[in-house]
A protein has these predicted regions:
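The feature marks the mature, well-folded catalytic cores of soluble enzymes
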Residues: 1-299
Length: 299
């Protein structure tokens, strides 16, 4: 069993470009289109938000490994193409959008290989239109070896099953419905797993699967229920991080923090020393992702 759920070390990518990715808007119903003439303005705002968030995490004792993105990768700010493990191995995953596949740069892989050994590189599956977008597709309960996942155009059901079986994770798979009536594109939109508490929106889980998921998440954790409306404010896109002395904190956007009610915040603060939040308005608006999407744990 894994010794810990969260990490003190986080990987982030400072984007070279940032705008609404036309290659992902078909499945990501949380991003807004951007006009070409707005690109520089959007990037400038996103960079301010990025650095403020990074500085906020570092100020609270989180160690950040930050690399710079490349041209042609508007979603480089969301490094969810790999996963690391406590045995110092890493796995690289198949991405749906072509410009997201380019995010796996030799420089980034080489840097990660200074710490981790590549156990599997599943990029070849992209040629077969089989996708499983790492920690966005799969929400890990690392301590209890459970993967939570909702199949979608970016999360192939068969490969998800195969991966969990080979890596000895118990899979809890369920169908979801977004505010548009389609599948929610990434599982980390609707839930996160902490050491003591799981935040999840049962409202967006299909009724046939809901009770089963409720039982599963309640086995080892306190559960914080998030509403469907709060999902639109990215309340589910949060991540537990470790500060100095192993203090556990929850990272999210200021929009998500503002959308939580007083009771929810009080519950979270029983399990966390602090809720770290930063303004990610531009990144959320045009990227369709929030705090968790920007952070990849280094175990």
């Amino acid at each position: 069993m894994s010794a810990k759920q969260s990490s003190n070390k986080i990987f982030m990518v400072e984007p070279r470009e940032f705008y609404s990715n036309p290659q992902t808007e078909g499945s990501n119903h949380y991003q807004m289109k951007s006009a070409n003439d707005e690109k520089q303005l959007i990037l400038d705002k996103a960079l301010i938000e990025f650095h403020n968030f990074k500085n906020n995490l570092e100020k609270n004792g989180v160690e950040i490994l930050c690399l710079k993105g490349i041209e042609g990768c508007p979603d480089h700010i969301f490094p969810n193409w790999f996963t690391t493990f406590e045995d110092k191995t890493m796995q690289i995953f198949p991405m749906n959008a072509e410009n997201r596949r380019k995010e796996k740069t030799p420089e980034m892989i080489n840097k990660l290989c200074e710490i981790y050994k590549i156990q599997n590189d599943f990029s070849y599956l992209e040629l077969e239109d089989i996708f499983l977008e790492s920690t966005s597709s799969m929400v890990f309960d690392r301590v209890n070896r459970i993967v939570y996942a909702t199949p979608s155009p970016r999360t192939n059901k068969q490969f998800l099953n195969e991966w969990c079986e080979k890596n000895e994770y118990d899979l809890c798979s369920f169908k979801t419905v977004s505010h548009t009536g389609s599948d929610i594109y990434h599982t980390d939109v609707l839930m996160y797993v902490g050491t003591e508490i799981i935040g999840i929106s049962f409202d967006v889980i299909d009724e046939k699967d809901r009770d089963r998921v409720k039982k599963k998440v309640s086995l080892n954790h306190k559960v914080l229920e998030i509403t469907a409306d709060q999902i639109l404010d990215f309340c589910g896109n949060s991540l537990e991080v470790e500060g100095e002395s192993g203090n556990l904190m929850l990272a999210m956007s200021s929009r998500a923090y503002s959308a939580l009610d007083t009771e929810q915040k009080d519950i979270l603060l029983k399990h966390y020393k602090k809720i770290i939040h930063s303004d990610l308005t531009t990144i959320e608006k045009y990227g369709g992702g929030s705090a968790r999407c920007m952070l990849s744990e280094l175990f």
